[in-house]
Amino acid sequence: MILVVTLACLIAVVCCQCPTTDQGQISKVFKAYDIDGNNKISRVEGTMVFRDADLNRDGALDNNEFSSEWAFYHNDYYSPFFNVADRNHNGRIEFVEGNQGFDHFDKNRDNEISSWEFTQTWMETVRPSSRPIDF
């Protein structure tokens, strides 16, 4: 159930004002999705996050699938993340939209998101003066 939070961050945090810049919270989110504990989120782990969250197995996350996990982990902050992640505005987050978010976080393009990449991208995005980042 907790697995969709990183997907949310990977997809959406790069385009909106996040609810927190707290290092402890960022670390907690990262560790929840570093499934094998190697201090990196691989593309395989990102795919697992998406598939686990896709409860009806239709290849996309609807608002209910997204919000049930997001609300559990971040209370009421899921809505802006969903709206930004839904790049084509069809009310669903398709797998390709999830991959776009992953690519944005993977700064060195090695198909893994390090703790540093995750934290830096999150922090750059939530700065009050930051503009939305397109990916």
Swiss-Prot record:
Residues making up the signal peptide according to the UniProt record: 1-16
Tissue expression summary: Component of the acid-insoluble organic matrix of the calcified shell.
Residues engaged in binding Ca(2+) 2: D106, N108, D110, E112, E117
PROSITE patterns assigned to the protein according to its UniProt record, in alphabetical order: EF_HAND_1 (PS00018), EF_HAND_2 (PS50222)
Binding-site residues for Ca(2+) 1, renumbered to this chain: D34, D36, N38, K40, E45
SUPFAM superfamilies found in the cross-reference section: EF-hand
Entry's localization field: Secreted
Annotated EF-hand domain residues: 21-56, 93-128
GO molecular function terms attached to this record: calcium ion binding
Protein name (database record): Insoluble matrix shell protein 5
